[in-house]
Each structure stands twice: as structure tokens, then as C-alpha cells.
Amino acid sequence: MRKIIHCDCDCFYAAIEMRDDPRLVGRPLAVGGRPERRGVVATCNYEARKFGIHSAMPMAQAVKRCPDLLIVPPAMDKYRQVARQIFAIYQGYTPLVEPLSLDEAYLDVTDSPMLAGSGTRIAEDIRRRVREEIGITVSAGVAPNKFIAKIASDWNKPDGLFVVRPEQVDAFVAALPVERLFGVGKVTAAKLRRLGAQTCGDLRGWGADRLQQHFGSFGFRLHDLCRGIDHRQVQPSQIRKSVSVEETYATDLRTLDDCQRELTILVDQLAARVERARAGDMIHKTFVKLRFADFRGTTVECVYPQVALPVFNRLLAQGFERRRMPVRLLGVGVRLHETDAHARQQALFAEGPPPGA
């Protein structure tokens, strides 16, 4: 049985700013661009979150919600330096560290000799060292796979640890609302609820074929996740260049209206994937992919820095117009800035790899 830890620094950028300037502690704080320059919130502390402020929110909207909000511009060089220090700590326990962003990573400690191989003790020690050596807090989840470990790390935030042991997986996942499943956004969750599935336990009553009938190939993923099954490996060198979702339909989509109805579901799934990948501020382009009944395909894309349904609808219309034929496959996605993707995952070690790497 694997031992996977998901580590997630609490409000990373804001935590570093509060560490470096104690006058900011206890006051609502957002890191991001100025509202007059149409800036957005990169992250905010928990005092700001009490006002409903969250990452990716336009800063002007954040200031309306909290007129006393303190705004600090991002200091990316400083954040990368802190990330290097934190990842050096991770690498001291296992070489199997998969960066998801500057502030988030998976660790596979299955074969680690540290602390008698206890995933719980390793997570506790990592949190202690980051707090004492770096001066910020990390929340961690320990579980037999990546899906459950990521959910667990969010369970006792901030500055928390939650462990899901192998014998607890079944009951833990059964009680989860369907919204917690990877790739399920608002539209998909609403469809699941209309079909009578409120929790993963409810969803287990559905066979894989029935889920596939309603949700296409994503139905097979739902079938596994609602049972706590996730075979993805921790991949230390993974660099994400795009995020996408596509579906091949058992019955061709004959009209543009048919395509637009399905597009809404796909965009919802894409938004959920982008959010979980922490890739929202790395988007460079958006695209729509179509494969027609004659198996010929086309892709339409444009420069646009966020997931927005109207933009995808416009691209879909352009692509559909090219052939005006029934569509057998539909896909949506975003392309990421390659330099930013490197900065998020590889430039952590731009000044040389951490000890043990």
C-alpha cells in the first residue's frame, strides 16, 4: 500500500509577506495587482477570506468587499527562493517529489527509511521543520493515493494534518459530496444532484456503463474516484504545458446547439481541473477541438487568459462553421505560458537543485 503526502502551504505569498512584515499580521491582506490596473488577487490571508475574497478575484471587487484591504505586489523572486528552501526539506525525506506549484507538492514516502517509514510522522516532521526553519505553515494530507491525500490536506486547514488510513478510505470517500471529486465543477455537480447523487456513496450505486452513458469517458473516472481508486503515480519531473478535457460521443452531435450544450459541461470540468492544478494565472490561450463524423478534425484557439464560457462558445461556432457536419468528439483546453510553467515547477531549482535532489 502506497503512502502519499500532499503538502500545501497556507496562503503562501501572503504568509511570506506577513512573516517579513509583522505589521501585516491580523489585517486583511491580498497579494496581487492594483485595482486601477485591473489586477487580480494572487492569494490572500484568512482575514481577507472572511470577506469572501479569494484567488483570481478582480482586485477591484476585493476592495469593494473589504475597503480596508491591504494590497502587496507579488515578489516572485522571494517566493521562489522560499519554495526552494521548502522543497529542499521535502527532498530530505524522499526523491519522489512532484511539484504542482511553488506552494504545493505530492510526496511518495512509501519506501522512505525516515522516521521508521511512517507517513504520518514524516508529515508531522515536515510541518514542524517548515514552521521552525521557514517561518510559515504547511497543511498536509496523508493517504494511500494522490486523490485522497489532496482532499485530506484541505481537511484541517490552516496549519493542519489529516490522515486517511487504508482501512478508512471506503467510509471517508463515501461521505464526500460529489463536488469534491477531481474534475467535477458546478455544472457536473448539479447534473449529478439532479440524477440523485449527493455523495460519493450515492454514486457507487451506479455502474460504470451508466456513468459513461451520462458523462462520457469521464464517467469511468467518476466510477473509480467515488470508490477512492486513483492509480496516478507521483511524477517528480512533470511539466504541465496545457490543461484540457475532451469527450467522444456515442451519438454524434448534429447541430451547433447540441455542441453548445455539451460544451457547457466540458468547460465546467476544465475550470475544475485548472483550479486544482493551480494554473489559473498561467493561462495564455484557450482552444476548442472538434472531430467531425468523417474523422477530420479542427482546432480553433485564441489568446485569452482565463476559462470563460462565452469565449469557448465563440471558438466552437468558428470551428463548427468550417465543416457544418455532425461532431463525434469535442474538446476544450487552455495552453499555459511555457516560461511560467517552468517557473512554477522547475525554476524552483534555478539556482541549483536542493540537497538530496
UniProtKB/Swiss-Prot annotation:
GO biological process assignments: DNA-templated DNA replication; error-prone translesion synthesis; SOS response
Name of encoding gene: dinB
Major localization listed first in the record, in broad terms: cytoplasm
Similarity comment text for this entry: Belongs to the DNA polymerase type-Y family.
GO molecular function: damaged DNA binding; DNA-directed DNA polymerase activity; magnesium ion binding
Protein EC: 2.7.7.7
Family matches, as PANTHER family: DNA POLYMERASE KAPPA, DNA REPAIR POLYMERASE UMUC / TRANSFERASE FAMILY MEMBER
Site feature location: Substrate discrimination: Y13
Residues covered by the UmuC domain: 4-185
Organism whose genome encodes this protein: Ralstonia nicotianae (strain ATCC BAA-1114 / GMI1000)
Range of residues in the leader sequence: none
Gene3D superfamilies, A to Z: 3.30.70.270, 3.40.1170.60, 5' to 3' exonuclease, C-terminal subdomain, DNA polymerase, Y-family, little finger domain
Subcellular localization, as worded in the UniProt entry: Cytoplasm
Active site: E104
Name of the protein this chain belongs to: DNA polymerase IV
Top-level lineage group: Bacteria
Catalyzed reactions: DNA(n) + a 2'-deoxyribonucleoside 5'-triphosphate = DNA(n+1) + diphosphate
UniProt cofactor(s): Mg(2+)
Cofactor binding annotation: Binds 2 magnesium ions per subunit.
Entry binding sites for Mg(2+): D8, D103
Entry keywords, A to Z: Cytoplasm, DNA damage, DNA repair, DNA replication, DNA-binding, DNA-directed DNA polymerase, Magnesium, Metal-binding, Mutator protein, Nucleotidyltransferase, Transferase
Function: Poorly processive, error-prone DNA polymerase involved in untargeted mutagenesis. Copies undamaged DNA at stalled replication forks, which arise in vivo from mismatched or misaligned primer ends. These misaligned primers can be extended by PolIV. Exhibits no 3'-5' exonuclease (proofreading) activity. May be involved in translesional synthesis, in conjunction with the beta clamp from PolIII.
GO cellular component, one term: cytosol
Complexes and interactors: Monomer.
SUPFAM superfamilies named among the record's database cross-references: DNA/RNA polymerases, Lesion bypass DNA polymerase (Y-family), little finger domain
